[in-house]
Amino acid sequence: MSGKNIPVGPIVLLGAPGAGKGTQAKLIAGHYGIPHISTGDILRDNVARGTDLGRKAKRVMERGDLVSNDLVNGMVADRIKQPDCDRGFVLDGFPRTVAQAEWLDRELAAKAGEKKPTVVVDVKVSYNQLLQRLTGRRTCPVDGKIYNIYLQPPKTEGVCDVCGTQLFQRVDDTEEVISERLKSYERQTKPLEEFYKKQERLRCVNGDQPVEKVTADIFRAIEGGAAAAGSE
């Protein structure tokens, strides 16, 4: 059943690398008829369109530096002011810090009639499952097809089903690198989770389940959060 008549409001989606956040964000957007706003996408879009913020971000990236909070916040602010965000939107990859979360609350409060994010969904996946998903990735250098030796292996070990080329593991998919990324995410996100917990906005979903079950649990969390916000 479509949820396009449900006024869900702003949704924040949290989840570690490998949690399937991007997949779930697209499913949420399609089900409720709201835009999926990924900070990576809007950054690339601003750079491609040559906006003022995009030009500034491009100069920063060309120096090899990280794009500042102010630039990212500005791009998010411009995007959520668009008419297609009036019924709600799902933010993927933002906020990453408490400072960004506080900024988002202020930005939404300034938007006519808006409150804090209706619900913050945290897709929780066990450490071992994340390691399997990320370290098991193998890529075809010819067509870019991605396999997973644990979850979606090629028909013949080590070679692409389509062209027969030897698959390779990216340097940043090794266990050492992945383990550090996950620890870094945990350190960064813990304060953010506590921030939203205190607001009673955080809804945790078990991401170890099959995709369809995770999606169903997310929809329930969103609609429960929307109902609670509507009664405030």
Where are these regions (language model features)?
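Glycine-rich phosphate-binding loop of ATP-dependent small-molecule kinases
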Residues: M1-E232
